[in-house]
Structures are given as structure tokens and as C-alpha cells.
């Protein structure tokens, strides 16, 4: 209607031509026009008006016309809308109208109106609405029950007609013909009515339920049915498709017409199934097992019937009667009895009949019944048949259940058109295939597009037009006081300058010199103690030093100094009258406990004495530091072992034996062996860092092996300025003992020694001596074959096994000897070499991994900028004037 408010009186005036004085619709034509107006109604007033008009209409033909035109569907739409909007008055009006309409089961199955009404009867908040809905539901249930009960009667009539036709061949034909004629008149009406009901009742659970409710005693039936079952099977074999129906009808019908009447209802169920699929369904529950088979077997009923007979004969044919088959769920009581055969017959009849359209059903039924009727009449016994028929009629209302093993469960879900559809379920595979093709095409196009994508702009860039903006109406900050405050503030602070380059290019590269990574050895050899090692000396050696334990009393300055001296020794050579470092230290220190470290620095001649010590060793000059240990390195204050100055200090041997006279032990522990024997004594070993020393007596045992480096057959180690170690010469064994004609090599300073075969090496500079000549520290001796090198004033001697040899020379008559280095000032420091009763000798590794001439390394930036480097002598770079000659 119009969008404005609607006056119901005006609406009724407009409809006056279609309505009577009482508001009832006059004719069928008027109801169709009113329905067309109802479809357009959107307002609640107009809808209620139309509903009242329908309520006032009493003529059944008008109401039926209203339903046929689509009024029932329209009411369903209005009911759904009013239920969603919870419009109670409109819901009540619609329910009253539905109650007034003559609805059938077919109408109720068309949509979900019945479902909505049932929901309202249970869940509605309004009590009156609930009552009204429950009344409507009960009314509809009554309609459903009445229709389900009427259907079997109609089936009976049809069966009787069929039997009459079939008995035209039999002598009893006249009785059946009369019945058939009487029912033939009723048939057309039933046919008209049935098409609707048949369609709606396709799954007809209503009938199934009604039959289930009507249970009767099944005991008598089995005995009489046995004979009928046998006959049926015979008939089936003769004519499989038609015989089955005929057998069902003929077995009971031949005996007597009244029996036929009772029996026909059972057969009518299959007939109805044949006529219309919908009708077939209601009786099928009784036929239980054959229902689905009948639907499936429609195209080839004969073949399927035979198969089913086989199945029924072993399982249900003998024990299951009519009801047993029809109710797959029902035949528990009668499985033992041979009744199952008759149910097989109706099942078979239903199966062939299901495919037949409703219009053709009567003709097909008649033909089928006539043919099997003749066959059935012969085998059926007249006396037993009438009883069976009557009982069968009764049994029609009885329910029997098969044995547990024969029970089958079927689920049938009827889809309501108005129900929600599962979207995920593929209904049309064609559509799914199209979607798949489209998705594949899309994926292919995107892949092709991406493969040719150069990440370049396809559209040329154009400079946008400049925007012409009107001058601002207000100058921003014109009245602001904060800008003046900020200006005053900026006068007293530094201006923030950001010197960003105007170009987007990378900044200029900073000068950078790659620094080799610092090597941090993981061995305990290089672990630096927090405090310098202090060795307590035991008295009892030959000749005690005047300072006693003075080595442990060195102040930090001297400790660093001695660390920098490295392998420097007092230059007391065979012909040298150099400065005695030991005496200078003694004069500086005085008595061991006389002065604290601070007072030593205040002595007037302190610096002069230090210069005297350092100048000969090149520590203050441009020359390289010989085997300089960094202050913090293993040879410095933290890692260096301080030995008391002065000759002959008693020293405990490494094995606990009495020590011989010792010289100043000012050298730190050697670096980790490189290529030789990795074993070396811990920081507590008094042998570490000093010359080989020990008493003239036999050594405790071969505990110490000669320290070996690389000898004549092996190339020297690659790193620059690593003190060469005593090594194998002449292919000596890897533990550092010289081979035949080779002497042990003593590690020296920075320069690589030049040796003859088996020559020994010292530290520092090179000096060429004669064969067997000795070398002081800081000099290189070039020995002849088997040449020897000693420490400062130390001599290497080699004697026969087990005895000490003379000092100052090494006999050449011993072809194979061990190399050992004696650096102590007195010539007594010789430990017998490995021999009979002789202790093992250790060749000393001179040199350190750091220190020496590093002028071939890059210059240390920190040292050049600040004048010092925090790594000091540990630094891996060149410090001019410290670990190499000063820059020119």
C-alpha cells in the first residue's frame, strides 16, 4: 500500500466489491485478487486486515483456492518475519488464520511453517501464543494421523480392483470383478487425491509410525503363512516381476474374497508404492528390508527381485512373514516362523512398482495382478487362504521384529526446500570445475606477470604541477611569546648544526687499517697471575746469594724493567768485562729488607745505575729489544718468575732434589712450544725461563725432556719476530734433542739464527765464532758442525754418559749428544744429559711470541697519536723506538 498511514476502513471500502456484508470473500476470483494485494502489503495494519478477511471466509472452495494460489506460502513468509521481529499480535493473527485454513499433509510438507509453529508452542515467551500454537500443532497432528489411516483404505480398494482383474482367468472371477467394479468408480477420485499425498508422503514416516503403534499378536500368522510363502516362491520363479505382486495378492485372495479384503491392505502398500514413489514410502516401513531396494531396483525389477529372493530365502524368507519384511525393524517375534516369504512378495511388488508413474499405476497394477492371479490361484489352498487373509489383514496392524542379526537401520533425511543449505557441500560439480579453471587461470596470469616484472616503473614520472595556494589569512605565530623566549634561549646555547651533505651518496670512507685479531692463547701456559710469582729459596746450595730472596723483593719498576730485558744476560763473555747486571741490582736494592720500593726511586744514582744496566742491552737505544717480554705478558710482572740475583743461589730442582748453584733467573717462562713438544712446566717450575741448571750429581730421572723447536730440516716458523726456539737439528727427534752431530738450540732474540748443520742458536745479534765457540746473550754464534751456543758466560759441554764434562768446550768425538743450554754465570751449571744414570735434560726455548724487531709490522696508531699504547709490549703493531728502530 502507500507509504503513509493506512486507514483500515478505507482499505475495506476499496475491497467492498470482493466482500460480502459480513466481510467474507464472495467468489474464487475475488480471493485471487485479494491474494495479489496481500503480496504487496508491507504495513502491519493492512496485513491484519487481510488476515481478518480470510478468517471471515467460510467457503471451503475459496479457502482451497487461496492455498493453491500461494496463500499458504505467503503466510509462511509473514510468519517468519513476525517471528524474527517478535511481533506477538501479528503472530497470533497468523496462527488463527492457519488454523482456519483446510491444510493437508502435502501442504504442511511444502515449507517449514509446521516447524515454526512447533517452535512457538515450546519456546514462545507469550503464554497465549504458546497455547494457540500448541492447539494448532495438535490439530495438524490429527490431520496427519487421519490421512495416514485413510491411505491404507485407498490401497485396499485398489488392490481389490487388481485382484478382480487378475481373477478374470480364475473361476472365482465374478466376485472379484464385482468388487473391482465398485472400487473402479472410487478409483478416479482416489487417483486425483493421491498424487498430492503420494508426493508428500514419499518418505511417509507418518504411516510408518502409525503401523508401528498398532501392534497385534503375531503368533497365529506364522503357521498359516508358511504355505503361502512356498507358493509365493514358486510363483516368483515362474514370473519374477509380476508374480511377486500377484503372489502377495493371490495367496490370500484365492481362498476367499473377505480374506482378500483384509489381505489387500497389505498388498495395497506395495501398490501405492508402485503408483507413486511417495505412497510407496509409507507402506515401505512395514516392508522394511525392501524399501530402499525397491527404489533402486525400479529400472530392472525382475533381476533385483530374484536377487532379493535369494537373500530373503536364507535370511528372512522362511522365518519372516509379511510384516517381517516390511518392517526391517519389526520382525523380531516372527523370524522363527516361515512367514518371511510373504513379506518378500510385497517387497518385490513394491520394487517393480516404484518406478511406475502415478497415472499409469492402475493399468500396470491390473495387468500384473491379472497375470499372477492365474498363477497364484492354482497353488493356493482354498481352506487355509481365507483364514490367512483375515489374519493378514489384522497383521497389517501388528508389528514384528526380526532377530538381532537381521536387523537393519536406515536413515532418511528429507530436505526441506526452505531449509538452510550447506554452502560447503558441492551441489554442482560443473560449477566447481569452472571455479577451479578460473583460479588456475588467475594463478597463471599472476605468475606470468611476476616473472616479467623488472621492478621498473611502467608509467613515466612527470613532475606535478606546482600548487598555487592563497596567502595565509593568519601568519602562524604572529602573536606568540614563546618564539621570543626561544630566541633568547638560543642566544646562550650552542647552535644545533647538522652537517648533512646535500647529496644522497654514501659518505666518504674513513681511513681504516685492518687489524689482525688478537690471539688469546687458551693454554694455561699463558695465563697471567694477578701477582708476580714469588719463589721461596731453600738454603743449602753451594754459595748463597748476598740478597737471599731479593728476587721476590724487586719493586714493580724493576720488575717491569727486567721483563722488558727479556733474555738479556749480563754480558760476561769469555773475554768480556762488561757490566754485571747482578752487581748493579745488588747495589740498587741493598739489603733485601732495607728499603721499601718508594725509597729506592729516591736514590740519587738510581737512574744512572739503571742506564748502566739497560744501555748494553739496547733497551734505551734504537736497537731491538732482545726477547723483550711485555710488562703484562708472561714474562712481565704477572707471569715472570723472579729469581734472586747473585750466583750460586740454592734452588730446588724440579724433582725435589738439591739444586746446584744458580744465576740470576730473570727470564720469564717461554712461550708455548710451536711445533715441538707441547709439554712445559707450569709457572711454578723453577726450570722455566732459566738456563738448564742442576747439581753435578745424577739427575732424579728423565722427567724433563729436551725442549725442541724446528731444526735444520724444518723451515723456521712464519711469524716475524718470534724468538727461534731450540730445535731439532740434523733431523733430531721431535722432543728437541739433537740428532747425531746436532746440538740443542736455545731460543734467542728476534733475529733468525744462521747455523751450520746442527748449530745452536742464541738470542739477539749474530756473532761468528770458531768451532765450538761460545756466545753471550744477544749474540749469534755461527758454529761449525756440532757447534755449540751458551748462555751468558755459559758453556755447553758434552761428555760421556753419566759424568759432567769440562766447561767451555764441547768435545766433538761424541757423535750423538743431547743439546742443552747453560746460561748461568758460573761454569758449574751443567746437568748431566740423558745417559746411564744421567737425568733428562731440557733444551730451553728462548724467545717470546712478542717483542723484538716489529718494524715490518704496521705502525700502531694509538702509539703515534698518544705516545703510548695500552697494550705496551703486547701490542701486535710497530712502536717506533720501543719494539723496533725509531722512524727516520
Curated annotation (Swiss-Prot):
Give the Basic and acidic residues compositional bias ranges: 153-166, 174-196, 596-611, 811-851
- Taking every annotated instance into account, which residue ranges of this chain make up the domain TFIIS N-terminal? 73-147
What processes in GO biological process is this protein linked to?
negative regulation of cardiac muscle cell apoptotic process; negative regulation of mitotic DNA damage checkpoint; negative regulation of transcription elongation by RNA polymerase II; positive regulation of telomere maintenance; positive regulation of termination of RNA polymerase II transcription, poly(A)-coupled; positive regulation of transcription elongation by RNA polymerase II; protein stabilization; RNA polymerase II promoter clearance
Modification Omega-N-methylarginine occurs at: 665, 693, 737
Q: Does the keyword RNA-binding apply?
A: yes
Zinc finger (C3H1-type) residue numbers: 854-882
Q: Which domain of life is it from?
A: Eukaryota
Q: Where is this region: Interaction with WDR82?
A: 418-619
Cross-link entry Glycyl lysine isopeptide (Lys-Gly) (interchain with G-Cter in SUMO2), positions: 179, 262
Renumbered residue ranges of the record's region Necessary for interaction with PPP1CC: 393-408
Residue stretches of biased makeup (Polar residues): 325-334, 583-595
Q: Where is this region: Interaction with TOX4?
A: 1-348
Q: Locations of Gly residues compositional bias?
A: 540-551, 724-762, 784-794
Entry-annotated residues carrying Phosphothreonine: 398
The answer, when asked if Ribonucleoprotein is one of the entry's keywords, is: no
Please list the residue ranges that the record marks as compositionally biased, kind Pro residues.
Answer: 644-655
Where in this protein does the record put region Necessary for interaction with PPP1CA?
Answer: 388-417
Gene3D superfamilies to which the protein is assigned, alphabetical: Conserved domain common to transcription factors TFIIS, elongin A, CRSP70 (1.20.930.10)
Could you tell me which residues carry Phosphoserine? 313, 382, 545, 591
Pfam families named among the record's database cross-references: Med26 (PF08711), zf-CCCH (PF00642)
Low complexity: compositionally biased ranges:
248-258, 674-690
Record localization: Nucleus; Chromosome
Q: What does the UniProt entry state concerning the protein's domains?
A: The TFIIS N-terminal domain specifically recognizes disordered sequences in protein substrates that are then dephosphorylated by PPP1CA (or PPP1CB or PPP1CC).
Q: How does it assemble?
A: Component of the PNUTS-PP1 complex (also named PTW/PP1 complex), composed of PPP1R10/PNUTS, TOX4, WDR82, and PPP1CA (or PPP1CB or PPP1CC).
Briefly state the protein's biological role: Substrate-recognition component of the PNUTS-PP1 protein phosphatase complex, a protein phosphatase 1 (PP1) complex that promotes RNA polymerase II transcription pause-release, allowing transcription elongation. Promoter-proximal pausing by RNA polymerase II is a transcription halt following transcription initiation but prior to elongation, which acts as a checkpoint to control that transcripts are favorably configured for transcriptional elongation.
Protein name, please?
Serine/threonine-protein phosphatase 1 regulatory subunit 10
Amino acid at each position: 500500500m502507500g507509504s503513509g498511514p493506512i486507514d483500515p476502513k478505507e482499505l475495506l471500502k476499496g475491497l467492498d466489491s470482493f466482500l460480502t456484508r459480513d466481510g467474507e470473500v464472495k467468489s474464487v476470483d475475488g480471493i485471487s485478487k485479494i491474494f495479489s494485494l496481500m503480496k504487496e502489503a508491507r504495513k502491519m495494519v493492512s496485513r491484519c486486515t487481510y488476515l481478518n478477511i480470510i478468517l471471515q471466509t467460510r467457503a471451503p472452495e475459496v479457502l482451497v483456492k487461496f492455498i493453491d494460489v500461494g496463500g499458504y506460502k505467503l503466510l509462511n513468509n509473514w510468519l517468519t518475519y513476525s517471528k524474527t521481529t517478535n511481533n506477538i499480535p501479528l503472530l497470533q493473527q497468523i496462527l488463527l488464520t492457519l488454523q482456519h485454513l483446510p491444510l493437508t499433509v502435502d501442504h504442511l510438507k511444502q515449507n517449514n511453517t509446521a516447524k515454526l509453529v512447533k517452535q512457538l508452542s515450546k519456546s514462545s515467551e507469550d503464554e497465549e501464543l504458546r497455547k494457540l500454537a500448541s492447539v494448532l500443532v495438535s490439530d495438524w497432528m490429527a490431520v496427519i494421523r487421519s490421512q495416514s489411516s485413510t491411505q491404507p483404505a485407498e490401497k485396499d480398494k485398489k488392490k481389490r480392483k487388481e485382484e478382480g482383474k487378475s481373477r478374470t482367468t480364475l473361476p472365482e472371477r465374478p466376485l472379484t470383478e464385482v468388487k473391482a467394479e465398485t472400487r473402479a468408480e472410487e478409483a478416479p477420485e482416489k487417483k486425483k487425491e493421491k498424487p498430492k499425498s503420494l508426493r508428500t508422503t514419499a518418505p511417509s514416516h507418518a504411516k510408518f509410525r502409525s503401523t508401528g503403534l498398532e501392534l497385534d499378536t503375531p503368533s497365529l500368522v506364522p503357521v498359516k503363512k508358511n504355505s503361502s510363502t512356498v507358493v509365493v516362491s514358486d510363483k516368483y520363479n515362474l514370473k519374477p516381476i509380476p508374480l511377486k505382486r500377484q503372489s502377495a495378492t493371490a495367496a490370500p485372495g484365492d481362498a476367499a474374497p473377505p480374506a482378500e479384503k483384509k489381505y489387500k491392505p497389505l498388498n495395497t502398500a506395495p501398490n501405492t508404492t508402485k503408483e507413486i514413489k511417495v505412497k510407496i514410502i509409507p507402506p515401505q516401513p512395514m516392508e522394511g528390508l525392501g524399501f530402499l531396494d525397491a527404489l533402486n531396483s525400479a529400472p530392472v525389477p525382475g533381476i533385483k527381485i530374484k536377487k532379493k529372493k535369494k537373500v530373503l530365502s536364507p535370511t528372512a524368507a522362511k522365518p519372516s512373514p509379511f510384516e517381517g519384511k516390511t518392517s526391517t525393524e519389526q520382525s523380531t517375534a516372527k523370524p522363527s516362523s516361515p512367514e518371511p516369504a510373504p513379506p518378500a512378495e510385497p517387497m518385490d511388488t513394491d520394487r517393480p512398482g516404484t518406478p511406475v508413474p502415478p497415472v499409469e499405476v492402475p493399468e500396470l497394477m491390473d495387468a500384473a495382478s491379472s497375470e499372477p492371479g492365474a498363477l497364484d490361484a492354482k497353488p493356493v489352498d482354498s481352506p487355509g487362504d481365507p483364514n490367512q487373509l483375515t489374519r493378514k489383514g489384522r497383521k497389517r496392524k501388528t508389528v514384528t521384529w526380526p532377530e538381532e542379526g537381521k536387523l537393519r537401520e536406515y536413515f532418511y533425511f528429507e530436505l526441506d526446500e526452505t531449509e538452510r543449505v550447506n554452502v560447503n557441500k558441492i551441489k554442482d560439480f560443473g560449477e566447481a570445475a569452472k571455479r577451479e579453471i578460473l583460479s588456475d587461470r588467475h594463478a597463471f596470469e599472476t605468475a606470468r606477470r611476476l616473472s616479467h616484472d623488472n621492478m621498473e616503473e611502467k608509467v613515466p614520472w612527470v613532475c606535478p604541477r606546482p600548487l598555487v595556494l592563497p596567502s595565509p589569512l593568519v601568519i602562524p605565530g604572529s602573536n606568540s611569546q614563546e618564539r621570543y623566549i626561544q630566541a633568547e634561549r638560543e642566544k646562550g646555547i650552542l647552535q644545533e648544526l647538522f652537517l648533512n651533505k646535500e647529496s644522497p651518496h654514501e659518505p666518504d670512507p674513513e681511513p681504516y687499517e685492518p687489524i689482525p685479531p688478537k690471539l688469546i692463547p687458551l693454554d694455561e701456559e699463558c695465563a697471567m697471575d694477578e701477582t708476580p710469582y714469588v719463589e721461596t729459596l731453600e738454603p743449602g746450595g753451594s754459595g748463597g746469594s748476598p740478597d737471599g730472596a731479593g728476587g721476590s723483593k724487586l719493586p714493580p719498576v724493576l720488575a717491569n724493567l727486567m721483563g722488558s730485558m727479556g733474555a738479556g744476560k749480563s754480558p760476561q763473555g769469555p773475554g768480556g768485562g762488561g757490566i754485571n747486571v747482578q752487581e748493579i741490582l745488588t747495589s740498587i736494592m741493598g739489603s733485601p729488607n732495607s728499603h721499601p720500593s718508594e725509597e729506592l726511586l729516591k736514590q740519587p744514582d738510581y737512574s744512572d745505575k739503571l742506564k748502566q744496566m739497560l744501555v748494553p742491552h739496547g733497551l734505551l737505544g734504537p736497537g731491538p729489544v732482545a726477547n723483550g717480554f711485555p710488562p703484562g705478558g708472561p714474562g712481565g710482572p704477572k707471569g715472570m718468575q723472579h729469581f734472586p740475583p747473585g750466583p750460586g743461589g740454592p734452588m730446588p730442582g724440579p724433582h725435589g732434589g738439591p739444586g746446584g748453584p744458580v744465576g740470576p733467573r730473570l727470564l720469564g717462562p717461554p712461550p708455548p712450544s710451536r711445533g715441538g713438544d707441547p709439554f712445559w712446566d707450569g709457572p711454578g717450575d723453577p726450570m722455566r725461563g732459566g738456563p738448564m741448571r742442576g747439581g753435578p750429581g745424577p739427575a732424579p730421572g728423565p722427567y724433563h725432556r729436551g725442549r725442541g723447536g724446528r731444526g735444520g730440516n724444518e723451515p723456521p716458523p712464519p711469524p716475524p719476530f718470534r724468538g727461534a726456539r731450540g730445535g731439532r737439528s740434523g733431523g733430531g727427534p721431535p722432543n728437541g734433542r739433537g740428532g747425531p752431530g746436532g746440538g740443542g738450540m736455545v731460543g734467542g732474540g728476534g733475529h733468525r739464527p744462521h747455523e751450520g748443520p746442527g748449530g745452536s742458536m742464541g738470542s739477539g745479534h749474530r756473532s761468528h765464532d770458531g768451532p765450538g765457540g761460545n756466545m753471550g746473550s744477544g749474540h749469534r754464534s755461527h758454529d761449525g758442525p756440532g757447534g755449540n751456543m751458551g748462555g751468558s758466560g755459559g758453556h755447553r759441554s758434552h761428555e760421556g754418559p753419566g759424568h759432567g764434562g769440562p766447561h767451555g768446550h764441547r768435545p766433538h768425538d761424541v757423535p750423538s749428544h743431547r743439546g742443552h743450554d747453560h746460561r748461568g754465570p758460573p761454569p758449574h751449571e751443567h746437568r748431566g744429559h740423558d745417559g746411564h744414570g744421567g737425568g733428562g735434560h731440557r733444551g730451553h726455548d728462548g724467545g717470546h711470541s712478542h717483542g723484538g724487531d716489529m718494524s715490518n709490522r704496521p705502525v700502531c696508531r694509538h702509539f703515534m697519536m698518544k705516545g703510548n699504547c695500552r697494550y705496551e709490549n703486547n701490542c701486535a703493531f710497530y712502536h717506533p723506538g720501543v719494539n723496533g728502530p725509531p722512524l727516520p
